[in-house]
Structure formats: C-alpha cells, structure tokens
Swiss-Prot record:
Highest taxon, organism lineage: Eukaryota
Gene3D superfamilies assigned: Knottin, scorpion toxin-like (3.30.30.10)
One Pfam family from the record: Toxin_3
Protein name: Sodium channel neurotoxin MeuNaTxalpha-2
Species classification: Eukaryota, Metazoa, Ecdysozoa, Arthropoda, Chelicerata
Cellular compartments per GO CC: extracellular region
Keyword field: Amidation, Antibiotic, Antimicrobial, Disulfide bond, Ion channel impairing toxin, Neurotoxin, Secreted, Signal, Toxin, Voltage-gated sodium channel impairing toxin
One of the GO biological process terms: defense response to bacterium
Principal place of residence: secreted
Occurrences of domain LCN-type CS-alpha/beta (ranges): 21-83
Length: 85
C-alpha cells in the first residue's frame, strides 16, 4: 500500500501540470489588446491557446480582450502601467 502511494506521488511530481486562467491578454509591454468586436478577441485569444475570448466593453482597462482558459505561458495584464503604445 505504501509503495502505491509513493509511486503515485512520484508520478504526480514528474508530470507537469498545465494550468489555465481567465484574464486580459497583454503584449510584451503590459498593454491590453484594444477591441471593438468579439470576433477579433476570439481570434486573438484562440491564436494564443485560449478556449475563447470576447471584447470586454467598459472594463477595468477600457475596451479590451478577455480570454478564457489562457495558458500560463501567454502574458496577461498585470498591475502597473502600460509601457508605451
């Protein structure tokens, strides 16, 4: 029984866990993708590995793309200023 627990734990630690998050997608300067229509955001989000996306009107960062289930490797908007437009 103990061996089964140890093997299971070892396998769990060896396999990488890919998580996803819902967030505003951002470029390398911490600026959101400005939008007007949902198809644009859906396309940009899917291009970056998300399940879907839509244009969040009048949101925290104005009209910006919000992605659902975005991979960890893709940059998202973090607190702080947008460094250039």
């Amino acid at each position: 029984m103990n061996y089964l627990v140890m093997i299971s734990l070892a396998l769990l630690l060896m396999t990488g866990v890919e998580s996803a998050r819902d967030a505003y997608i951002a470029n390398d300067r911490n600026c959101v993708y400005t939008c007007a229509l949902n198809p644009y955001c859906d396309s940009e989000c899917k291009k970056n590995g998300a399940d879907s996306g839509y244009c969040q009107w009048f949101g925290r960062f104005g009209n910006a793309c919000w992605c659902k289930n975005l991979p960890d490797k893709v940059p998202i908007r973090i607190p702080g200023e947008c460094r250039g437009r």
